Amino acid sequence: FAVERASTSVVSDLLSLRAEMSNHMVDSSTVREENQRLCEELIGLPKAPRARSEFTKEMQDFLNVCHYRDQLLDLIDQFDARMRDMGYLDFGQQMAYAAGLACAHPQVGESERAHYRVVLLDEYQDTGYAQRIFLRSLFGEGQDPTLSVTAVGDPMQSIYGWRGASATNLAHFRTDFPAEGGASAPVKYLLTSWRNPGEILDLASVYTRHLSSATRAAVDVPDLHPAPSAAQADIHCRYFGSAEDEYTWIAQYFRTQFDTAKEQGTLPP
């Protein structure tokens, strides 16, 4: 291979690239063409007057990755051919084919809209690009102003980025599913947390404010507030030398809470 990789890493890279291709609804020829364009653009850059070699280390590393990607694409073509021979489809392929079908044939959406007049989409921050295109083609783009589509989601809880999910789909929802007349769909916030005390919410707000600037730029997320009945919380910060040490501390902490409650004749927190 163009870069040194263990066989297990090659398999992981292949599956990851293949999943991203399905999620973004592109085939190997499209990726290969873009990959070649990037290589040619880099090779065509003017060289430094006193450069000792044609490419800097960073440029050579980039080219090696491009060549490696080409090699992965060849393997993906073979992998997909084998899948077809065996009559298999994975979830990513099914989703990409469904999205392509809904885009290319408007009658599919017409049929679905005739059956479903109210559409509720939960955990929308965990949808991928192909899912977004699929749902938009079926129920969005202002094709039926009398149709009701509602999405619920929290971009701060997006946990499936590794499989292609994008919290920015929430931001796109407003224009993918516009209100009557073409205006952006309205947004309503559920700002009361019924499961967390205020101290935990304050800490979470500080944490996400520093780590999620890209998401916050795309989707404005107000801070949550505790319910009036929320109790106070104790926040502990610990560093452990191993995972086993962490497990032991957590188990002992809960053991102490239960033992104390038992001695006092009360229910544990």
Explain the meaning of each model-derived region.
Residues 14-24, 28, 41, 45, ...:
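Phosphate/oxyanion-binding loops and surfaces in catalytic or ligand/nucleic-acid-binding neighborhoods
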Residues 135-139, 170-175, 249-262:
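Short, well-ordered amphipathic alpha-helices
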